[in-house]
Amino acid sequence: MTTFNTISVIGAGAWGTALANACARAGRQVTLYGRSTDVLAAIAARGENPRLPGITLEKSIRVTHDLAESAKADALLLVTPTQSLREAMIALAPHVADATPLVICAKGIERGTRKFVTEIATEVLPQTRPAILSGPSFAADVARGLPTAVTLAAAEEPLAVALTHALGSSSLRPYHTTDVRGVEIGGAVKNVLAIAAGIAAGKALGASALAALTTRSFAELMRFGLACGAHRETIAGLSGLGDLILTCSSAQSRNFTFGMALGRGEAPPGSLSEGQSTAPVLIEIARAQAIEMPVAEAVANVLAGAITVNEGIEMLLARPFRAEG
């Protein structure tokens, strides 16, 4: 089996830093690339990223703002928001060697092109071997070494297996699959549905309503996934159902907290949630393929200003009675 002893994490935000810590804990030689010299200086001087306060990082992590140097690792983890992936990949392109594994750690669909994240990689970095890491995980939990399980997908099963062994440890448990599209869909779609869950929580509709909404959201996720070629077991697994449950039930999720602010009629948090960017393109795809997604469509319409939050709730509650499925 191929081993990946050196790993570079491209992106020194909370999630990138957490993954760097997990990889270092797994015994890999880790380089963490970031553009903010202040963040890198804090990590180098104090062993702590200001975006993960109170969490001590592994001393072996090396930080750098030299992208060319970072690209020399055996495997790369690309940890940037979906709408910035193309720009990051273009910057990486001159420096990445042929057949380098590129593990994308983003959840979304590119606006304008409707491309999933590995499709962007195939277009911009055709010399790499793309993979995707996704699942129910918060940066602080992973950084602290709390038990977390995720899914790692690559089209080549030997690559997926090798990466699983390279990144995995007693605290971070990756499960491998070749269903790349299924993992991409789970991560992208649940972000939009989590906004709906946050709205329900913000409107104080009750635990019963939140449970019903999450369940019906899963039905939408499954419909969309199967229509787009995902495997049923992937959508019902960690990167689908698992991630949906986590982000529909925790204020640690930016999508959930964004929805809560909408439900309360408050100004949304400053940081952009992936679901905000994904919602309109998700509905474009759903409409083009005649996939019924009333919850996701209500979210997209609220975000577009076409309807109010209350109107969206009323529309969902006024839908015709039907058989479950």
Curated annotation (Swiss-Prot):
It holds the Pfam family NAD_Gly3P_dh_C. GO terms for cellular component: cytosol. NADPH binds at W15, R35, K107, A139, R254, L272, E274. InterPro entries: 6-PGluconate_DH-like_C_sf, 6PGD_dom2, G3P_DH_NAD-dep, G3P_DH_NAD-dep_C, G3P_DH_NAD-dep_N, NAD(P)-bd_dom_sf. The active site is at K190. Pathway: Membrane lipid metabolism; glycerophospholipid metabolism. Keywords: Cytoplasm, Lipid biosynthesis, Lipid metabolism, NAD, NADP, Nucleotide-binding, Oxidoreductase, Phospholipid biosynthesis, Phospholipid metabolism. It catalyses: sn-glycerol 3-phosphate + NAD(+) = dihydroxyacetone phosphate + NADH + H(+); sn-glycerol 3-phosphate + NADP(+) = dihydroxyacetone phosphate + NADPH + H(+). Its EC number is 1.1.1.94. One of its GO terms (molecular function) is glycerol-3-phosphate dehydrogenase [NAD(P)+] activity. One of its GO terms (biological process) is glycerophospholipid metabolic process. It is found in: Cytoplasm. It comes from the Bacteria. Sn-glycerol 3-phosphate binds at K107, G135, S137, K190, D243, S253, R254, N255. PANTHER family: GLYCEROL-3-PHOSPHATE DEHYDROGENASE, GLYCEROL-3-PHOSPHATE DEHYDROGENASE [NAD(+)] 2, CHLOROPLASTIC. Catalyzes the reduction of the glycolytic intermediate dihydroxyacetone phosphate (DHAP) to sn-glycerol 3-phosphate (G3P), the key precursor for phospholipid synthesis. Belongs to the NAD-dependent glycerol-3-phosphate dehydrogenase family. This is Glycerol-3-phosphate dehydrogenase [NAD(P)+]. It comes from Afipia carboxidovorans (strain ATCC 49405 / DSM 1227 / KCTC 32145 / OM5) (Oligotropha carboxidovorans). The lineage of its organism: Bacteria, Pseudomonadati, Pseudomonadota, Alphaproteobacteria, Hyphomicrobiales.
